[in-house]
């Protein structure tokens, strides 16, 4: 069905359509006066490289949401194929207090938790926030990076985790 009437698109139809899209899987983490918290997210996007800026969308009903706002910092940890279980844990399978018990965590510039072995970690300061529907779009200035090479990226598509194998880039 093709429709241009926004009222004709139900929330369930929209969620079903979005489930068909493949997205990288991230653990978004924070720490500071509001406490340590984290969640799994696929709604992360580059905004600009000058200055380096990302956006992440967080549901205002999430138990972790107040900590992100109070702390004003976050780290977007992009997951590898080895982190599927961790992605499920941070998606709500385990309580907030137990989510950081597993792998090694470090810190970069902002103090937000950085997952050791993440494909890449974007250490950010929240510089703007926009309310849209049930979510906030957080605009985040990247203050530091950590990355590894050779790992396979974890994706989420069709309501299942998938792996995107790394390929060698071919020179000209």
UniProtKB/Swiss-Prot annotation:
One of its GO terms (molecular function) is FMN reductase (NADH) activity. GO terms for biological process: nitrogen utilization; uracil catabolic process. Keywords: Flavoprotein, FMN, NAD, Oxidoreductase. It catalyses: FMNH2 + NAD(+) = FMN + NADH + 2 H(+). It comes from the Bacteria. InterPro entries: Flavin_Rdtase-like_dom (IPR002563), NADH-dep_flavin_reductase (IPR050268), RutF (IPR019917), Split_barrel_FMN-bd (IPR012349). It holds the Pfam family Flavin_Reduct. Its EC number is 1.5.1.42. SUPFAM superfamilies: FMN-binding split barrel (SSF50475). Catalyzes the reduction of FMN to FMNH2 which is used to reduce pyrimidine by RutA via the Rut pathway. Belongs to the non-flavoprotein flavin reductase family. RutF subfamily. HAMAP family: RutF (MF_00833). This is FMN reductase (NADH) RutF 2. The gene is rutF2.
């Amino acid at each position: 069905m093709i429709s241009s009437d926004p009222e004709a698109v139900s929330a369930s139809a929209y969620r079903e359509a979005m489930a068909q899209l493949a997205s990288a899987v991230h653990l978004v983490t924070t720490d500071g006066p509001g406490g340590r918290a984290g969640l799994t997210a696929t709604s992360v996007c580059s905004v600009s490289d000058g200055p380096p800026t990302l956006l992440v969308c967080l549901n205002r009903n999430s138990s972790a949401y107040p900590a992100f706002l109070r702390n004003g910092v976050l780290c977007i940890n992009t997951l590898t194929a080895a982190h599927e279980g961790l992605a499920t844990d941070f998606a709500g399978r385990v309580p907030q207090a137990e989510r950081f018990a597993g792998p090694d965590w470090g810190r970069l510039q902002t103090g937000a938790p950085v997952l050791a072995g993440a494909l890449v970690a974007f250490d950010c300061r929240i510089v703007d926030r926009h309310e849209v529907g049930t979510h906030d779009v957080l605009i985040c200035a990247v203050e530091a990076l950590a990355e590894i090479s050779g790992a396979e990226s974890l994706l989420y598509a069709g309501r299942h985790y998938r792996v995107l194998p790394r390929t060698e880039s071919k020179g000209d």
